[in-house]
């Protein structure tokens, strides 16, 4: 199962952490993992194309995206990513788990 942890502060995304494997199919054939990876990579690349200092990310066994600048464009792209993850989870709820923390 892919596990996603989203941290917000006053509605702004501070970080997104992801780990695990969807387990929908064998490695290399898993459409859930392929979709999830595509969404993550596309979002990271779009943000870095606009401003290479807007986020930091690590991609080992656990992916973590940290929103450094928290500007409108970066936050909009990260919110779009979260919305896409929820949409994917709605179709594959046995393969994706999402937790959100919001600090005011």
Predicted stretch roles:
Residues 1-32, 38-41, 45-104:
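N-terminal intrinsically disordered, cationic/polar leader segments
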């Amino acid at each position: 199962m892919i596990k996603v942890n989203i941290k917000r502060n006053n509605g702004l995304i501070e970080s997104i952490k992801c780990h695990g494997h969807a387990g929908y199919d064998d490695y290399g054939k898993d459409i859930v993992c392929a979709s999830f990876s595509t969404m993550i990579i596309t979002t990271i690349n779009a943000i870095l194309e606009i401003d290479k200092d807007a986020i930091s990310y690590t991609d080992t066994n656990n992916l973590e995206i940290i929103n450094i600048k928290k500007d409108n464009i970066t936050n909009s792209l990260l919110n779009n990513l979260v919305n896409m993850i929820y949409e994917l989870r709605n179709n594959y709820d046995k393969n994706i788990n999402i937790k959100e923390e919001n600090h005011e």
